[in-house]
Regions:
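Hydrophobic alpha-helical segments of integral membrane proteins
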Residues: 30-33, 50, 68, 72-76, ...
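Membrane-interfacial loop-to-helix junctions in multi-pass transporters
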Residues: 1-7, 34-44, 123-131, 212-221, ...
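Central hydrophobic cores of alpha-helical transmembrane segments
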Residues: 25-29, 48, 150-158
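Membrane-core helix-loop-helix motifs of multi-pass transport proteins
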Residues: 31-134, 138, 293-367
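Transmembrane helical segments that form the transport core of multi-pass membrane transport proteins
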Residues: 145-264
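Hydrophobic alpha-helical transmembrane segments of multi-pass integral membrane proteins
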Residues: 1-29, 223-231, 237-285
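Hydrophobic alpha-helical transmembrane segments of multipass membrane transporters and ion channels
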Residues: 4, 85-93, 219-227, 256, ...
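Hydrophobic core segments of alpha-helical transmembrane domains in multi-pass membrane transport
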Residues: 5-13, 89-102, 129-143, 152-166, ...
Length: 367
């Protein structure tokens, strides 16, 4: 069922905090299964993108979630709480549409997954005990554990379970010239930090079982640092104030302020081609304006996520759009219409602003 793609990707994305990781792992597998079932690649790709970004938005481990909260100067979990008000309706509409699509369009293909299942069983020791690691991470997320602590615990538990339950994988990846303890340590460090690939008889599984580790995230980290420096420089020279003044002259009421913020995020995603730059610059640009209107900062952080984070995957030349289309092997043009959650989110935040639903005020300024 097509909606199952959304649910699976949502769970993985919440647990990992990364839409990119979700696409590069289960996303690839789901697209492969979809092709075997002769389901349009764009439909499966759209479901993967929708689920991945739903989880990315609500995960306290997500880089964009932390960035939007930090730029808007909002407590992380308060930011996530306010995100649910617009995010849950958006994903609900998406699921309903995919259920309807599933009823009206049945798959004509037939796939035999026994080869993939047997390959996985022959490669790994599969046990329900292995679910302990993601369950503990999810519990820590629910308990509002700081992201770094949750990531550290998840990493250490994953390493321990790898030693206990997957010794054959460690032996395969290790240098046999070293002692078992040293070899295991080296494999675990390499897995956490750099590229590791587990070879099987299936090309789909080979892609699924490949990882870039922490080094694979360095480009993203450098990009975030660069955007923060750029945003700070723009603020220091007064450029943000000049641009925001021109925009704010048009935003003479609360709805227009929200609309201007959404427009700014979309424009930066289109021109700067990066969601981090869109979040940082728009956040700094409208922070004072929201305060002057007597609006709590969580309104701004939510709007940044609803318009900057999710729409980045809908633009072919944006870093997110280019990445997802490349990894999934599905062009943005193919999955755009099916990534319903992503393009409905900006409209949802505008509807809430127009109807003044869940718009928290500071209570100290004129409304």
């Amino acid at each position: 069922k097509r909606q199952a793609c959304i649910i699976i990707c949502s769970i993985i994305s919440v647990a990992t905090g990364s839409s990119w990781t979700t696409s590069a792992t289960v996303g690839i597998a789901l697209v492969g299964i979809g092709k075997a079932l002769e389901i349009p690649a764009g439909m499966v790709g759209g479901a993967v993108i929708a689920g991945a970004y739903f989880g990315d938005k609500l995960s306290p481990l997500s880089d964009t979630t932390n960035l939007a909260a930090a730029v808007s100067k909002v407590d992380l979990f308060k930011h996530i709480k306010y995100l649910t008000y617009t995010t849950i309706p958006s994903i609900s509409i998406t699921l309903i549409v995919f259920i309807i699509l599933g009823i009206n369009q049945s798959s004509s293909g037939v796939t035999d997954n026994s080869f993939l299942i047997n390959t996985i069983e022959n490669t790994f020791n599969i046990s329900l005990i292995l679910f302990i690691v993601p369950i503990i991470v999810l519990i820590m997320i629910v308990k509002k554990t700081p992201p770094i602590k949750a990531l550290t615990v998840g990493t250490l538990l994953g390493a321990l379970f790898a030693i206990l339950f997957q010794p054959q994988i460690i032996n395969e990846l290790s240098d046999s010239s070293n002692s078992s303890i040293i070899a295991s340590y080296k494999v675990l460090i390499d897995t956490i930090t750099s590229d590791v690939s587990i070879t099987t008889e299936s090309e789909i599984l080979n892609e699924l079982f490949s990882t870039g580790g922490m080094i694979g995230m360095l480009n993203t980290i450098f990009l975030v640092m660069a955007t923060m420096i750029f945003g700070g420089s723009m603020d220091a020279i007064g450029a943000i104030k000049s641009i925001s003044k021109a925009l704010l002259n048009l935003a003479d009421n609360i709805f227009k302020l929200f609309a201007s913020t959404v427009a700014s995020c979309l424009a930066l995603n289109l021109t700067a081609s990066d969601q981090y730059l869109s979040i940082v610059v728009s956040g700094k640009m409208f922070e004072k304006a929201f305060e002057d209107k007597g609006l709590a900062p969580e309104n701004l952080s939510r709007t940044l996520e609803d318009s900057a984070t999710v729409t980045s995957a809908l633009i072919p030349w944006n870093s997110c759009g280019a990445y997802h289309s490349s990894v999934l092997g599905v062009s943005v043009g193919e999955y755009f219409i099916y990534a319903i959650f992503n393009w409905i989110s900006p409209f949802m935040t505008l509807i809430y602003a127009a109807l003044r639903i869940k718009i928290r005020t500071l209570g100290i300024k004129n409304q």
